[in-house]
Amino acid sequence: MGMVNEITNKLIDIKGRIAFEHKDYIIYIDNSRKKEVDSGDIQIFKDRKQVYDFSIAYPSKECKSKGIYNNTKDKFINNIDLEKLHEIIMTTGL
């Protein structure tokens, strides 16, 4: 859970929606619904094609757990995708 914690801790304070370029990727983060459901979304594009579509569960008063769900594969993130997402997110200037 170390990488999941690092990613969620880096993204939890983002308000609303942001989009930016980083390396060869366009990254779109949407935390606009975080107050309602304690979750956000990350979409990552490369060469105008969506390569990742994740949902993030942030901790709340009712539920302290965190998680990253791969919407494309309809299951929680696997280690390969987690390592790639970690590499992308942790090297941004957020």
Labelled PLM ranges:
Residues 2-10, 52-94:
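Mixed-charge, Lys/Arg-enriched low-complexity segments
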Residues 1-36, 74-75:
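Negatively charged, low-complexity tracts enriched in Asp/Glu with abundant Ser/Thr
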Residues 17, 46-50, 84-85:
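Gram-negative host-targeted secretion-system effectors, predominantly Type III and Type IV
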Residues 19, 41-43, 67:
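Residue-level detector of beta-strand face positions
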Residues 21-23, 30-32, 45, 57-59, ...:
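A structural detector for beta-sheet-dominated domains
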Residues 36-59:
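A short, structured beta-strand/loop element
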Residues 25-30, 43, 50-51, 76, ...:
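A general secondary-structure boundary signal
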